Regions:
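N-terminal charged helix/coil linker that caps or initiates catalytic domains
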Residues: 1-23, 158
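Conserved active-site and cofactor/substrate-binding residues in soluble primary-metabolism enzymes
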Residues: 26, 34, 70-73, 77, ...
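Glycine-rich adenosine-cofactor-binding loop
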Residues: 19-44, 48-54, 193
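Glycine-rich phosphate-binding loop and adjoining beta1-alpha1-beta2 segment
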Residues: 46-86
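Short His-Asn-centered micro-motif
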Residues: 26-29, 50, 94-95, 109-112, ...
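Glycine-rich phosphate/adenylate-binding loop
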Residues: 22, 102-106, 110-237
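Conserved beta-strand segments of alpha/beta enzyme cores
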Residues: 46, 89-91, 133
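A structured beta-alpha segment of the ubiquitous adenosine-cofactor-binding alpha/beta core
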Residues: 73-104, 111-114
């Protein structure tokens, strides 16, 4: 049963229109933990979360966890946080995703390394008809990227794969950065969840606020100074 009152946003995003579609969130770190909580606050119930880490002291400043969660598996702590905030239950898996798992309609790919993302993509997402949308985020100190891909569309597959890089690059520029700033993660996570909102409204044609939209596949932002750039892979030659 949906225990959260969604009347304040239902004209922009209706959980009933989303229905029983399954969402898989792979990684419950700086962006993943926030994304899971935001999805639940939208009223979505079929949320599945994968992570194999425990909450450590350095996670408190940039993730949704509290001091009381230190030492607990992230997925267990996140389950309790979501329940306390929304009354909703999420499904959790305290395990590493290796590509053997069957994933659902929407996948948020948010693991710590680019190599693990590529492995999961190749084995469990790429050209899998069960998954209609993949959203991936990358974060630096004051900048980030959001990728929004239909993994069965060849132009989008090619466009996303051309953005990939090795872990040694990621360590200094994006998701592997040793510096992680909470407000950057907040901005990135909200931007990622908004792409799900946009996707559903485009898919259903039921955006009751009357806004016409076309999905972007790459969104780049910088916060110093505030700048945002977008690109659509379907328009690539």
């Amino acid at each position: 049963m949906n225990n959260i009152d969604t009347t304040r946003h239902v004209d922009v995003f209706s959980p009933d229109a989303f229905g029983k579609r399954r969402i898989d969130v792979i990684g419950a770190g700086a962006s993943g933990s926030r994304i899971v909580l935001a999805l639940a606050k939208l009223g979505l119930e079929n949320i599945h979360v994968f992570d194999f880490d425990i909450v450590e002291a350095h996670n408190i400043a940039n993730q949704v966890f509290s001091q009381a969660d230190i030492g607990r598996p992230k997925v267990e702590a996140l389950r309790d946080i979501v329940k306390a905030h929304t009354g909703l239950e999420i499904t959790i898996y305290n395990e590493r995703v290796d590509g053997s798992q069957k994933l659902g309609d929407v996948v948020f790919l948010l693991t710590d390394t680019m190599s693990s993302r590529q492995e999961i993509w190749k084995k469990a997402i790429r050209y899998k008809v069960a998954t209609k949308l993949m959203i991936e985020t990358r974060m630096g100190v004051d900048q980030g990227r959001v990728y929004v891909v239909n993994p069965t569309r060849s132009a989008q597959v090619r466009g996303w794969e051309e953005t990939l890089y090795d872990d040694d690059v990621a360590e200094v520029s994006a998701c592997g950065s040793t510096i992680s700033v909470g407000p950057t993660a907040e901005y990135l996570s909200g931007l990622a969840v908004w792409q799900l909102i946009r996707w559903l409204n485009i898919e259903t044609g039921k955006s009751s606020d009357g806004v016409s939209d076309t999905l972007d596949h790459e969104i780049l932002f910088c916060l110093r100074p505030p700048t945002i750039l977008t690109r659509q892979f379907d328009q690539l030659i």
